[in-house]
Regions:
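Negatively charged, low-complexity tracts enriched in Asp/Glu with abundant Ser/Thr
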Residues: 1-24, 56, 79-85
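Short aromatic-glycine-(Arg/Gly/Cys) micro-motifs in beta-strand/loop hairpins
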Residues: 24-50, 68
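A short, charged, amphipathic alpha-helix used as a generic interaction element across diverse proteins
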Residues: 54-72
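Short, solvent-exposed secondary-structure capping/transition elements
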Residues: 73-78
Length: 87
């Protein structure tokens, strides 16, 4: 997966791409960056980084971030089955 595919998948799931920052952004929110030896995903809040996870490729990092964001924000969740009452 590349960045364009990642952004398209976010949009498909009703997630605004603006919540993700790339590279050495100082924005709060969700971040993906290339470190010296690996790609990293993490969240930044009030200038502090949390939940930093390393990956061998950008594609792996993007897939992980997509999975996490879909689990949190996706609006296309299957509705629970409704049970019929029998008389």
């Amino acid at each position: 997966m590349n960045r364009n595919e990642f952004i398209a998948r976010l949009k498909e799931n009703g997630i605004p791409p603006e919540i993700v920052s790339f590279d050495s952004s100082i924005n709060d929110g969700y971040n993906i960056r290339k470190n010296k030896l690996r790609w990293e995903t993490f969240t930044r809040e009030r200038g502090k980084e949390y939940n930093c996870i390393g990956f061998p490729s950008e594609s792996d990092a993007l897939q992980h971030m997509l999975d996490e964001l879909i689990a949190i924000y996706a609006r296309n969740i299957v509705e629970p089955q409704r049970f019929q009452e029998y008389s």
